[in-house]
């Protein structure tokens, strides 16, 4: 993920949650927060909740993330388990209270389902200029 972001022109820094909580690094010195997959707590449903619960149940860290996400100049992106993480903190993400949650499917296993996703007009830096594009996405 870091290589892709660098290739796209972003400056990248690896930051551990403990560095934010202990104020070794200041989240407000960044403009973006990208949480990739990576098998945090295993590659299973709910794996992202370990990190999201760390934020939601720690008043100090929750406030830091809430302030960062409330700044309209900042952006966030969650991929794979990172998407589960972002879903787990949606309570502090402006405009995200109605987001869907992840649930187990009937087989309790990963099942690839290919769907087409149409990009609507939006202010996302990731979809700028892609309005009307239809892209394939797999999900379980």
Located regions from the model:
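Conserved beta-loop-beta connector loops within the AMP-binding
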Residues: 123-134
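N-terminal beta1-alpha1 cap of cysteine-dependent amidohydrolase-like domains
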Residues: 1-79, 83-95, 103-112, 118
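Sequence-level motif detector for i,i+2 pairs with an aromatic at +2
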Residues: 112-114, 132-133
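Conserved small/polar residues in nucleotide/adenosyl-binding loops
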Residues: 140
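Histidine-centered catalytic micro-motifs
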Residues: 137
